[in-house]
């Protein structure tokens, strides 16, 4: 085993020298996902994900158990340190001062220098900020840039939200798990019997929730709009069922100047959505309708293309099947065109499935529901009159796009040149696994 480990160490160190040296610029280019910069090579990005997945498995295999346990026990420290970085706008100050010393940063932020040094040291070990090995001066890097309040992706909204209220909320998760406890951790934390989304609306917390979900829409839009073949539905009105406050619709219409869309949401959220698309907004004329209602009871707008983004994970299997059947019954059938696009975080093993596992516990605590595996989504689809035709894993996203086609209503058969149901093979443009 010693020889194998020596060989492994040599190869890893050699790869690091290349990736941090002559390949650094190319790597940065491949990892940058933004509205104005998206590498034309999706295949290289997927190879990077393959490598991350394998290295994570290697890390899990080699790490001594006590180190893994300690990491789990103190994982909350990561969230709280990131919260400090956000609270005091460290990345924003570094951006103005860079390169800067800890003393300069402490003076600019009004923070205790020793405490700031410890926070920055922790952040550096997480990968945030670059530090000159000779001078010790700090600069932003591709990771710390995500903490800037002026960054296009607004990730800072997540950093401000989840380590605060959600952190406190999860303290009630052990209570929820008792077999005699009918309430969720969220209901216990807020001391309410009302459904969570109703409670958020009635207590003025809905705006903060939509701000966070809106960030997810903004962050994922470049990859979602680049890596799925939207040209196949360019002549159709895409109905966003559960559209939130319209962040995805805005990105979609901005990306495709000839596209049209429609939104279906709860009445209170639909009103907010209408306010975000006033008459003088040039995109408003391409929004066919904004409808308020209950998608289990009220009529859903007719179309041949529907989008459900971060919707099914809120509901149990029976409700998911009911909703998918309602859409199937409402859908305008156009062979080769009609489809519903399910955008969710699919559960799978390894590092690349970690985001979905985080979300799975959030859904458990929020509404006693869950994220699902690809097999579970396939089963839901089949029971509701659909078939899973294609799965796409877009760049820069925490989600996958699952394309469902109505059974018996479209020509062709599911394509199958993917790389299997593994995260690394998630060039799942894969089309059917």
UniProtKB/Swiss-Prot annotation:
Superkingdom: Eukaryota
Associated pathway: Secondary metabolite biosynthesis
A Gene Ontology biological process term: secondary metabolite biosynthetic process
Pfam family, one: Methyltransf_2
Protein name: O-methyltransferase hasC
PANTHER family in UniProt: O-METHYLTRANSFERASE CICE, PUTATIVE (AFU_ORTHOLOGUE AFUA_4G14580)-RELATED
Disruption phenotype: Abolishes the production of all diketopiperazine derivatives but leads to the accummulation of large quantities of L-7-dimethylallyltryptophan, as well as the trans- and cis-isomers of L-7-(3-methylbutadienyl)tryptophan.
UniProt enzyme class: transferase
């Amino acid at each position: 085993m010693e020889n194998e480990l020596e060989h492994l160490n040599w190869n890893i160190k050699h790869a690091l020298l290349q990736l941090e040296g002559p390949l650094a610029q190319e790597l940065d280019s491949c990892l940058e996902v933004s509205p104005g910069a998206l590498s034309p090579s999706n295949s290289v990005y997927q190879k990077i994900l393959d490598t991350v997945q394998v290295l994570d498995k290697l890390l899990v295999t080699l790490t001594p158990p006590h180190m893994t346990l300690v990491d789990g026990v103190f994982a909350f420290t990561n969230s709280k340190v990131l919260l400090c970085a956000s609270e005091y706008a460290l990345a924003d100050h570094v951006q103005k001062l860079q390169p800067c010393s800890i003393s300069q940063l402490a003076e600019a932020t009004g923070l205790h220098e020793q405490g700031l040094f410890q926070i920055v040291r922790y952040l550096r070990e997480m990968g945030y900020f670059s530090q000159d090995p000779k001078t010790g001066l700090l600069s932003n890097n591709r990771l710390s840039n995500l903490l800037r309040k002026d960054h296009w992706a607004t990730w800072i909204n997540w950093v401000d939200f989840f380590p605060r209220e959600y952190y406190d909320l999860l303290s009630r998760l052990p209570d929820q798990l008792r077999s005699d406890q009918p309430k969720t951790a969220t209901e216990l934390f807020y001391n309410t019997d009302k459904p969570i989304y109703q409670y958020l609306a009635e207590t003025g917390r809905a705006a903060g929730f939509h701000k966070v979900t809106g960030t997810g829409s903004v962050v994922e839009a470049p990859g979602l709009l680049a890596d799925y073949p939207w040209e196949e539905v360019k002549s159709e009105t895409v109905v966003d069922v559960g559209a939130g406050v319209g962040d995805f619709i805005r990105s979609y219409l901005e990306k495709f100047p000839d596209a049209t869309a429609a939104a279906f949401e709860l009445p209170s959220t639909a009103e907010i959505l209408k306010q975000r698309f006033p008459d003088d907004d040039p995109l408003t004329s391409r929004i066919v309708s904004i409808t308020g209602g209950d998608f289990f009871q009220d009529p859903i707008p007719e179309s041949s293309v529907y989008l459900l983004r971060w919707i099914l994970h809120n509901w149990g299997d029976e409700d998911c099947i009911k909703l998918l059947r309602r859409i199937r019954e409402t859908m305008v059938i156009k062979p080769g065109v009609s489809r519903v696009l399910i955008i969710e975080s699919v559960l799978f093993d390894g590092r690349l499935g970690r985001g979905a596992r985080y979300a799975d516990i959030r859904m458990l605590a929020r509404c006693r529901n869950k994220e699902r595996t690809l097999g579970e989504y396939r089963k839901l689809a089949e029971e509701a009159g659909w078939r899973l035709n294609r799965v796409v894993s877009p760049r820069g996203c925490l989600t996958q796009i699952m394309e469902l086609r109505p059974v018996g209503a479209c020509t062709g058969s599911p394509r199958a040149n993917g790389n299997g149901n593994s995260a690394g093979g998630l060039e799942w443009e894969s089309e059917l696994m």
